[in-house]
Structures are given as structure tokens and as C-alpha cells.
Amino acid sequence: MESSLLNHLKIDNFTTQNGVLYTDFPLSYQFFGQKLHTAPIILVNHALTGNSNVAGEKGWWKTLVGYGSVIDLQKYTVVCFNVAGNGYDGFFIDNYKNFTAKDMARLFVLGLENLGIKELYALVGGSIGGSIAWEMLCEAPHLAKKFIPVATDYKTTDWLHSQCLVQEFLLESKDRPLEKARIHAMLNYRTPESLNQRFKREQDEQKNILKSHDWLNYHGTVLDNRFDIKAYRLMNQLLKTIDAKEEDLLKINSEIHLIGVDSDLHYPAFEIKNSYDFLKNNGKNVYHHEIKSIHGHDAFLMEYEQLNEILGKIF
């Protein structure tokens, strides 16, 4: 069985959409489950502050990916790349505006080629990882037998672009920029109902602040301690530049399963339903699923029982 150690490869002479040449570009990844080329392969793309460690004791999606889980490591080889520049492997990109979501998708496709992977049994991506996956299939329409984008879409809408713009303003702050950006982002990842139901305007008497205030401070501090602002700026740039073309979507040859969240503010449910309608009306083999939750975008990480049930019917 394949280890989950961090592995590295190099992409030679990679030119970004903006025309910037990188002669020797690093890409890191992890394997989980069966030895490569001995079982069907599933690629999982991580979310904005995630990484390649998708399974195992500290795996960010260990409720779905594991031995005996819905994505069963006894049956599959799971691969997960780090978005280049996310810092998990120590690599950062200073000139983050050189890159778009399409560039990262192209790097992932080249990374698969480097590993000798010509076909995936499934391509799964949550949030921005799913958006990068859309761009991957526009580059390589026959890459995956099954495509499962979760809480995501193939484009940066005006709403999402506006959120990214606010993030940029906050990241330019001189005082605690990453902490501020994370606090704002958390309000986009959850919903008013979720926070109101959880905190009920209760005070933390010891700190003399609302418990909701303390919760936001906690999330800001935690990310500030474990994530680098260079990585966050890059990820926000990628989120702002998702731009798969509808004509390219129609070339995708996968069985497509769109999974939305009914209360999502980040990638709203109606946008995912519109994408489903477009693909269905154009004869694509597409299915629509929806997680019911008050928790908004983060429900794709929180409502694991619902997601397990949906994925169980696909795998």
C-alpha cells in the first residue's frame, strides 16, 4: 500500500496565462491507499486553506477518504496535489498575480502526466478545489470517468469576485491582515442562521465580548498561526480568476455529479442549479445533488453524513 509521505516533482518550462515562464516549477503531492497503477485512481483537490493531507489521522476529509470509508482506500489509489504556493511544502509564490485558476489546473494535469496517470476513475474537488477541477477537465475533457465538484462552480461570479476584492483590501492592512481576512471569510462560509442559532447573543463573561465575537477571533488567530499571508494572497487570486468557458464545458466526457449546499453564500445553490440546467439542456451526463444545512458553504466539511450518503450512491 502506498504511503502518505509528501512527494515532489518538477514541471519544466511552464508558461502562465499571463506569459510568465518558469523553467523549473515545483509541485508536491501525497498518495493514499493502494499502490499507484494497481487500482482505480481518484484525484482529490483541496479547498482554499487545505492541503494534500486529505486522509489519515489529521486528514481534512478523513470522514470521506479512508479504509472502509465511502472513498475506500482498500479499493482506490487517492492522489492529492498541493496547490502550488500554498506553503504546505515550504514553497511560496511572491508574484501571485502571475497565476490564475486555469494555470493551477494546467499544472495539475501536467503533474498527472508526470506520474504516468492518463485516466482517473474520479476527480473530486471541494470549494476552489472543485473550481480548479472544472478548469482541468476543460483542458483534458477525457481525463476522468466521474467528476464530482462539491460546493463549487466553474466561474467566479460578480458576487464572489466582490468578496475576493474585500479580501484583497483586508490583506493590504498593516495590522493583522491575515486574521482580518479570515474573519471576513468566515462570514461568507457560514450563514446568519448558523451563527444566530449557535450563539444566541450570549456573552463570554470572562472576556466581556459576545461569544460569536470570540469565535471569529479564534478562527482568525488559528489561521494566522498556521498559514502564510503569501499563500492566502495566492489562493484569493485563484478564487478571483475561475473562468472556464461554457463551450469547453460541453466537451467534458465525464459523468458529472454537481453537489451544492442549499444555504451556501460562497457558491450559491441557484448558481450550481443553473450550471446543472445548462449542462443537462445540452445533453451532458449530469446529475444534481444538494446538501440541506443551515451552515452555508462549510456544510461540505460539516455535514459529512449527508455527503457520505450522496457519494455512496456514486462510488
Residue ranges of model-derived segments:
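Conserved acidic catalytic loop of the alpha/beta-hydrolase fold
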Residues: K102-Y121
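Alpha/beta-hydrolase-fold enzymes
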Residues: L143-V222
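N-terminal cap/lid subdomain of alpha/beta-hydrolase-fold enzymes
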Residues: Q30-G87
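Catalytic-loop region of hydrolases
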Residues: M1-I41
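Conserved alpha/beta-hydrolase "acid-adjacent" motif
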Residues: L265-E271
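Conserved hydrolase catalytic core segment
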Residues: E119-D158
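Short beta-strand/loop motif that positions the catalytic acidic residue
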Residues: I252, L258-G260
